[in-house]
């Protein structure tokens, strides 16, 4: 179906092989514009005899006739997922299908985002482009966070943007010991929290905390402290295979682990989180030439010198 071959690298690359037979939909449940797009997607799929599937919790967004599945079964056999909402909805969709390596098309039904590919009025053209194989798949580095309590692994969390250890609002400072790669102790951080971000996540919480914007084509991990109470307050940029080990120190209050904006668990003193590059890349569908820096310019209302001084 699509053209191109070879091993994809970071950035827009070759299309996946095979025809489009089964499509999944992830819909922002509280946004009427996303529900309207869901009905549009359902009509398109029915007209082309494409099997459409949604999550059981979002069945009403696409109509009662659309088959639904629980999260564990949702990605099985899918050729594509369409996320209807904003960047948060797209991150949720990617999290559902990350291990299955299903590409995701993000449709923006909210504010300008860095990840969604098309605006709401561009959905019909984008769906036709995907049907005809006129699209590419962009690979993004992901994160895998291994959580240990009492030296025993209790969970592994996958993230596209970031993994955050953060104190509760009323608690005193988070105290976290950091090791980098296979080396010894690097530093003890006293801060509101610590962010480990992918290049994709560099425009999210890490940026708000003072971190740099990093090209999504770069393989890297970013370590950014949140409001640090120490002289060293800069972001570290690491090779993704080096990894970061975060230990909640005994004198620290319990911290909250947040994965792609979702609070997933409380971490008591002594808990350890080891973050490395994920085994699976996030796969984003692109129907137009990706221009990351145009998005940065638009998001932050940047202008060239002539516009600023004129």
List the predicted regions and their residue ranges.
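ATP/nucleoside-binding phosphotransfer catalytic cores, i.e., glycine-rich phosphate-binding loops
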Residues: 165, 170, 181-182, 232-310
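Catalytic core of DAGKc-family lipid kinases
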Residues: 112-193
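Short glycine-rich anion-binding loops that position phosphate/pyrophosphate groups of nucleotides
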Residues: 30, 87-89, 112, 200-202
